[in-house]
């Protein structure tokens, strides 16, 4: 089994390190990559190109996992590579014909913007260290939370401003994992995305927005169980 791990906004491939150790200890292969967070012109299509260039050409045993903003990218990857499955982890789900900003404006599910209060003249955004610790990493150890917060980058938002390049949903099976104490992406949105957009019941885990750091073993077990269920 080969898990291709697609990080969310502000993060990088580093955020998956603990989860990769757990997945590989269970006999799986993993791939992670850095997406061009700081490129103002990079949208979901560009992100998908980066993912596709990093993953195996034969995707028949690949599951692509997209965290948070990475959820806007993984259906595009699936449309090209036809992996075994895709997993949205506390993820945004695109709607063909709309931008995610349009989705946000249309929702009445309690969604509030998860963007940080610090904006920059170039249109990017960034998180103050303490705010990131409280929002993304509140259930991690203080050492892990602070180290992660210090590695966050600026983020540009072309991927949410643009109309998604996804034209329609394909046949690749999807799963959705939400975290019940998520402070970055409201649980109401996650349930709406899973049930109303994907037509599936979400898998619910305890904890905050970053289970790959706070509960990597549990997350690895859940990802493995989804794979078994799809076989």
Predicted segments with their positions:
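Active-site loop/oxyanion-hole signature of alpha/beta-hydrolase fold enzymes
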Residues: 29-63, 77-79, 100-109
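Conserved alpha/beta-hydrolase catalytic His-Asp/Glu region
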Residues: 121-168
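Conserved serine/cysteine hydrolase catalytic core
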Residues: 154-217, 221
